[in-house]
């Protein structure tokens, strides 16, 4: 039977990610694996940035971006940076599962936060960290089904290792 030494878990910090993480910890405990928790902050596509900056002007666009970031930080975390807030949320995932380094049969865990294209960053981090498995959580579809978005499709297409997509938690 194949064993997974390093599992890359991708999270968007949603309830679906939290549910998927419970399965990741079960696998990690079964295999004695290390878990890498990855959160990618999606970038605004360059072409869209260009169009908006031309519409409003470069200075106004930068001002809008700065204002948006400040408001988002204030709304979500007060004075805590967005990266710190994400680290706290990911640590909360670990705490809920009773996961700490070298505890409970898990070889360890690491939290990585990156900015960029989500699928590309997941594939890059999988290779850089020599991951044997990628685990992603699907989201709930519009009509109570499971939605597999473009990021999951791109990772499935480009992955060099197995990818597990965990459906959303059953309702009820």
Model-assigned labels for residue ranges:
Residues 2-71:
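Small/aliphatic-rich secondary-structure junction motif
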Residues 47-50, 123-124, 146-147:
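Short, well-ordered secondary-structure micro-motifs
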Residues 1-3, 78-134, 171-172:
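Structural beta-alpha unit
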Residues 52-56, 129, 152-154:
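Short, hinge-like loop/turn segments at secondary-structure boundaries
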Residues 116, 133-158, 168-172:
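Glycine-rich, Arg-bearing micro-motifs that act as flexible, cationic patches
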């Amino acid at each position: 039977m194949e064993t997974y030494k390093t599992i890359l878990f991708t999270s968007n910090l949603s309830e679906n990610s939290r549910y998927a993480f419970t399965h990741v910890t079960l696998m990690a405990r079964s295999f004695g694996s290390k878990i890498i928790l990855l959160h990618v902050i999606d970038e605004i596509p360059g072409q869209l940035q260009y169009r908006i900056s031309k519409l409003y002007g470069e200075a106004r666009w930068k001002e809008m971006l700065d204002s948006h970031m400040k408001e988002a930080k204030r709304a979500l975390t007060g004075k805590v940076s967005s990266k710190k807030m994400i680290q706290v949320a990911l640590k909360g995932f670990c705490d809920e599962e009773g996961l700490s380094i070298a505890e409970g049969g898990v070889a360890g865990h690491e939290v990585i936060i990156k900015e960029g294209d989500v699928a590309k960053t997941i594939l890059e981090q999988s290779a850089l960290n020599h991951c044997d498995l990628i685990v992603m959580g699907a989201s709930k579809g519009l009509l109570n089904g499971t939605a597999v978005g473009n990021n999951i499709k791109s990772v499935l297409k480009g992955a060099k290792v197995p990818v597990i997509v965990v459906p959303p938690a059953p309702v009820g």
